[in-house]
Amino acid sequence: PTDAQTDARSFLSEEMIAEFKAAFDMFDTDGGGDISTKELGTVMRMLGQNPTREELDAIIEEVDEDGSGTIDFEEFLVMMVRQLKEDQAGKSEEELAEFFRVFDKNGDGFIDREEFGEILRSSGEPVSEEEIDELMADGDKNNDGKIDFDEWLKMMENIQ
């Protein structure tokens, strides 16, 4: 297996792999161990994904490395894991945007030092003014004295 295939298997639980295999096998009508790219969309929808036509074409182009017009189970796993990770990344970014808006009290699109201090104090941990300044300086990449949304995302990525 390729590195991507090994990574895909380690990302998924045994139950998920079994569930994906069951869906995959339903469409592998001749038992040859692969499905046609046409059937891919149907399988993905069964597993709760909802790819657009364009997304499907892009996925197929990426996954069908040998250009055979079919996808084997290992290629399929790699693709499903990519989709799941993209879904998760999209969700967490939305949640972070929501969080950002809550702390951007005056709605100016920035979190200033005062708002930033409130965030840190709201965690319940005691925080000194120096620590607030230090963290603020770390996050404020363009040194304008405030944290914009991109800087906020970067800070949150480093925490996770």
From Swiss-Prot:
Binding site for Ca(2+) 2: D64, D66, S68, T70, E75
Residue span, EF-hand domain: 15-50, 51-86, 91-126, 127-160
Gene Ontology MF terms in the entry: calcium ion binding
Repeat as UniProt keyword: yes
Residues where Ca(2+) 4 binds: D140, N142, D144, K146, E151
Cellular component per GO, a single term: myosin II complex
Binding sites annotated in the UniProt record for Ca(2+) 3: D104, N106, D108, E115
SMART domains: EFh
Binding-site residues, Ca(2+) 1: D28, D30, D34, E39
InterPro entries in the record: CALM/Myosin/TropC-like, EF-hand-dom_pair, EF_Hand_1_Ca_BS, EF_hand_dom
Keyword list, A-Z: Calcium, Metal-binding, Muscle protein, Repeat
Function comment: Troponin is the central regulatory protein of striated muscle contraction. Tn consists of three components: Tn-I which is the inhibitor of actomyosin ATPase, Tn-T which contains the binding EF-hand for tropomyosin and Tn-C. The binding of calcium to Tn-C abolishes the inhibitory action of Tn on actin filaments.
Record PANTHER family: MYOSIN LIGHT CHAIN 1, 3 (PTHR23048), TROPONIN C2, FAST SKELETAL TYPE (PTHR23048:SF57)
Additional free-text comment from the UniProt record: Skeletal muscle troponin C binds four calcium ions.
Family of this protein: Belongs to the troponin C family.
Name by which UniProt lists this protein: Troponin C, skeletal muscle
